[in-house]
């Protein structure tokens, strides 16, 4: 390359070389190109976000080169994955040849592993690393509870999260067939700051978490599941369910309600809930009783400890409402 450090110029040079040497058209695959813009949005760096996504920013310029290459025939197609609709909205005015496939029924199952795929995956791992299918039912139920449950259209089939299922099976294989102690991929946990940024206030954050972890869902308008929307809408209080959906945090339960898809996401959101509501989860509250339970199997003391030490920190009105529901 004669111009280094400028992605747009480098791509132009590569395409010019392909044309000059009569090479086949180029296929471009771009994954999570908006990862850095998501970080800018959730870190309150709106001015820099505007700078990199609008006018003649490097991001828009890069996609203009792709558009030109497709028009000239040096690029056969460009396929982008892992892109938030808010970034698509800021880019597609200049890259107006894009067709958004996210919610198309023929492509939905690309977003995770189907049950048939996960079944084959698990059986392969069991055969290779344990030598038998004896524990299939046990492990299958474990992965369904923790990694399944993602639905990307109201009537679509449930899918496994491919990333966290692979995390588990990799650990399972390394442990020679032993279930890993840590069931949650730490990459899923993000700083509580992003939640406050999305909801814009502590009270809004608490209300949203109450709906998700206590009432078991957020109501949404199915018409809002558009393939792109602007930044202002992304942070609108009435739009939280859809914003969370596109961030991969919630899933569609039906045409009216979104919910947390599995125990993994529920555990993560419960941690958020505890932090925002200052609920103490320290070991001294629970560990002594847990230790005694492993020796004496005193289930009554275990339950009593849970009610006194954990639920005892919740406001009485919240417990009453939850029990009544």
Indicate residue ranges for each PLM-predicted region.
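Phosphate-binding site recognition
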Residues: 1-316
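Conserved small/polar residues in nucleotide/adenosyl-binding loops
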Residues: 320-325
């Amino acid at each position: 390359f004669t111009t280094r450090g400028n992605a747009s110029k480098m791509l132009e040079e590569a395409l010019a070389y392909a044309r000059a040497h009569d090479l086949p058209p180029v296929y471009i695959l771009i994954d999570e190109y908006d990862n850095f813009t998501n970080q800018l949005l959730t870190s309150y760096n709106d001015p820099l976000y505007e700078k990199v996504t609008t006018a003649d920013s490097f991001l828009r310029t890069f996609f203009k080169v792709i558009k030109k290459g497709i028009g000239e025939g040096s690029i056969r197609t460009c396929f982008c994955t892992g892109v938030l609709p808010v970034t698509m909205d800021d880019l597609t005015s200049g890259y107006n040849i894009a067709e958004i496939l996210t919610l198309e029924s023929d492509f939905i199952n690309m977003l995770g592993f189907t049950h048939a795929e996960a079944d084959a995956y698990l059986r392969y791992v069991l055969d290779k690393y344990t030598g038998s299918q004896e524990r299939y039912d046990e492990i299958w139920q474990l992965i369904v509870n923790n990694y399944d449950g993602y639905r990307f259209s109201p009537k679509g089939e449930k899918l496994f999260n491919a990333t966290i299922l692979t995390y588990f099976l990799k650990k399972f294989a390394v442990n020679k067939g032993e279930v890993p102690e840590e069931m949650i991929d730490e990459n899923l946990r993000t700083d509580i700051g992003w939640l406050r940024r999305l909801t814009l206030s502590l009270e809004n954050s608490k209300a949203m978490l109450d709906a998700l972890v206590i009432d078991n869902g957020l109501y949404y308008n199915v018409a809002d599941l558009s393939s792109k929307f602007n930044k202002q809408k992304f942070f609108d209080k009435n739009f939280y369910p859809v914003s969370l959906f596109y961030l991969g945090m919630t899933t569609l339960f039906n045409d009216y309600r979104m919910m947390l898809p599995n125990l993994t996401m529920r555990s993560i959101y419960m941690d958020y809930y505890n932090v925002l509501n200052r609920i103490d989860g320290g070991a001294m509250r629970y560990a002594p009783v847990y230790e005694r339970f492993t020796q004496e199997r005193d289930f009554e003391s275990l339950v009593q400890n849970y009610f006194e030490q954990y639920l005892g920190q919740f406001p009485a009105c919240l417990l009453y409402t939850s029990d009544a529901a």
